[in-house]
């Protein structure tokens, strides 16, 4: 069996990793061994943070909805409960958008929730 020299393959593999590590500080962008570890760690962070992004946005929407609901004399949980009872199907993302950009529409929804709660 002939001997395989790794010149082309190794160069391609190294180049692929070093390209991904472009912009990293110091040895992390220049030395293959260090760059490979940095790229693997970056991929782990990216995977984890794609999951966290969903949680963080939901938390942000809830904070915004709560702030707007309190301007109308409701807490977040009572607003959501009232909207459910009034069978208003609107998700938190769009509710937060209304709370920030269309206060009049949000006010109408808050009134609907109050009526459904009997208040």
Curated annotation (Swiss-Prot):
Q: A Pfam family matched by this chain, by name?
A: Ribosomal_L20
The question of whether Ribonucleoprotein is a record keyword is answered with yes
Under CDD domains, the record lists: Ribosomal_L20
The record's annotation in InterPro entries points to: Ribosomal_bL20, RIBOSOMAL_L20_CS, Ribosomal_protein_bL20_C
Look up keyword Zinc-finger and say if it applies. no
Cellular component terms per the entry's GO annotation: ribonucleoprotein complex; ribosome
What's an example of a GO molecular-function annotation for this chain?
Answer: rRNA binding
Q: Which UniProt keywords apply?
A: Ribonucleoprotein, Ribosomal protein, RNA-binding, rRNA-binding
Highest taxon listed in the record's lineage: Bacteria
Gene Ontology BP, a term: ribosomal large subunit assembly
**What is the recorded function of this protein according to its Swiss-Prot or TrEMBL entry?**
Binds directly to 23S ribosomal RNA and is necessary for the in vitro assembly process of the 50S ribosomal subunit. It is not involved in the protein synthesizing functions of that subunit.
By sequence similarity, the record places it as follows: Belongs to the bacterial ribosomal protein bL20 family.
Protein name from the UniProt record: Large ribosomal subunit protein bL20
Q: Which organism is it from?
A: Coxiella burnetii (strain Dugway 5J108-111)
Q: What is the lineage of its organism?
A: Bacteria, Pseudomonadati, Pseudomonadota, Gammaproteobacteria, Legionellales
């Amino acid at each position: 069996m002939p001997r395989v020299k790794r010149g082309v393959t190794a160069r391609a593999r190294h180049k692929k990793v070093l390209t991904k590590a472009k912009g990293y500080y110091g040895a992390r962008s220049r030395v293959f061994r260090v760059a490979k570890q940095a790229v693997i760690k970056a991929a782990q962070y990216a995977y984890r943070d794609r999951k966290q992004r969903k949680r963080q946005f939901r938390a942000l929407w809830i904070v915004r909805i709560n702030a707007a609901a309190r301007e109308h004399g409701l807490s977040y949980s009572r607003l959501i409960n009232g909207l459910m009872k009034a069978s208003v199907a609107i998700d938190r993302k769009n509710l937060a958008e209304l709370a920030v950009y269309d206060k009049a529409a949000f006010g109408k929804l808050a009134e609907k929730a109050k009526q459904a709660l009997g208040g």
